[in-house]
Amino acid sequence: MSSTYAVVNPATGETIREYPEIADDELRAAIDRADRASRTWPGSSTVAERAALVRRVGELHSERRQELAEIVVREMGKPIEQALMEVDFAGEIYGFYADNAEGLMADEPIELLGGEGTALIRRSPFGVLLGIMPWNFPYYQVARFAGPNLVIGNTILLKHAPQCPESAEAMQRMFDDAGFPEGAYENVYATNEQIEWVIADPRVHGVSVTGSERAGAAVAEVAGRNLKKVVLELGGSDPFILLGTDNLDGAAQAAAEARLDNTGQSCNAAKRFIVADELYDDFLEKFREKLAAAKPGDPTAEGTEVGPLSSRTAADRLEDQVKRAIDNGAEVVVGGRREGNYFEPTILTGIEPGDEASQEEFFGPVAQVYRVGSEEEAVELANQTPFGLGSYLMTNDKEQAERVADRIEAGMVYVNLVGADSPELPFGGFKRSGFGRELGRYGADEFVNKKLIRSA
C-alpha cells in the first residue's frame, strides 16, 4: 500500500488534505500509457489538431481562472492577485504555442553552398518526456514545458512538487477536458526514488527539471548514465545593477517589485542590488521605504503584496541564512523578523563579496545591497556567483548598457525594465543556473528530432 503525505496551508498551518504517493505498479502503468500514446498519437493527429487541443487548455485557464488561483493561494500562500496573473500568463503561453505550432514544426530549407538538389531539416516528436516541476509557479512552469511539447506530439509524464498536488489535479482535469488522448499528459505523484528508475526506463526519452541546483544535479547524473537529454532551469542570484537613473523613486519601486515577486520565491527574482556610489545612499533610503511598506498579509486578500513562505522548511532555511549573514557582519536595514511562515521584507548591507551569503540564493523577501565605485566593479560583483540566470540593469547611458549587457554572465539581461517575461522570449541561464531553454522558438526546439533530408 502506498503511503500518504499531508499538504499544509502555509498561511494558516491547517492541513488541506492527505495525498497518496503513487505505487510502483501505477507509475509503470502511467509510463505504459505515455509510451502507447507516443507511438500512435503523433501519426494519427495533425499539428493543427494538436494545436487546437493546446489552445483549449489555455482557454480553460481563463474559464477556471478564479478556481485555479485560489488553489495555489491555499497550497503555497501566493497572494491572490499574483496567483491570478500566473494563471493568465500560463494561458497566454498555451495560446502562443497553438498560434505558432505550424511554423515551429515546418520544414526548414537549407541553402546549399554548392552542387545541385535541395536540403531541409524536418522536425519530428522526441517521444515520452518526464517533466519535474517546482511548487512556486505550478501553472506557469507546466505551460512552459507542456505547451510546446504537446503541439510537437511528445507525450508527458508530469511530476509536480509535493506541495501542490491540488494544482496538479486541476491541470490534469484541464488536459482531460480539452480532449487529449489517454497517455498524452499523465500526472504522477512520484517519489525521488521512483523518479530515478523512471528516468532510466528506455521508454522515457528526455527530462526537463525546474528546481534547485541540487535537484538538477541529481537528475542530470541519472540521465547522463542513461544517455537521456536533459534541460535544467535551476537557481539564480540575479543582480540588479543601478548605474544611472533620472527617477530614483521609480528605480526603487522597480527594485522592490523585482525582489518581492512571489514573496521573493522566484528563481529569476533580483536578489543582489549593486548600486553606484553616487546613488547608493538615496537609493537605499527609498528602497527601505518601499520594502517597509510591503507588509506581509493574508494571501487571500486583495492588495496583499507579500504572503507567507511556502512551508515551515522554507522559512527555517531563510531565517538561518539571514542569521548566518548577520553573524558574519551583515547589517539589517529593515525587516529581519519572522512570524510563523511569514518573513518580513528585509534589506541586508555590509556583506562582503565572496562571503557565504553573497554566494547563496536567498529564496524569500531578502535583498542584499552593495555599493560600487565603478562600472568595472559592478560587472565583477555581478558575475562573482556560481549562478547566471537573469540580471537587471538600469542606466541612462545606451553605450554603457551595451557594454555591461555584453559582459554580464547570465542567460537574460533586462535593461531599464523588470517583469518582462513573454511567451516568445527564451528563458534560461548560464553556469550553475542550468542549460537549455524554455519558451519561444528555442524552447520548442529542445525536445524535437531534427532530420536532414538531402535530395539530388
Regions found by a protein language model. Name each.
Residues 1-117:
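N-terminal Rossmann-like NAD(P)+-binding subdomain of aldehyde/semialdehyde dehydrogenases
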Residues 10, 24-27, 47, 65, ...:
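Residues at or immediately preceding the N-termini of alpha-helices
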Residues 12-18, 204, 241, 295, ...:
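Conserved C-terminal structural/oligomerization subdomain of aldehyde/semialdehyde dehydrogenase
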Residues 13, 50, 72, 94, ...:
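Residue-level signal for inorganic ion chemistry
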Residues 15-22, 39-43, 130-131, 240-243, ...:
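Short, well-ordered beta-strand elements within core beta-sheets of diverse protein domains
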Residues 35-38, 42, 58-65, 69, ...:
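Structural signal for hydrophobic packing residues in well-ordered secondary-structure cores
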Residues 108-250, 372:
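Rossmann-like NAD(P) dinucleotide-binding subdomain of oxidoreductase/dehydrogenase enzymes
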Residues 214-352, 415:
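ALDH superfamily catalytic-core signature
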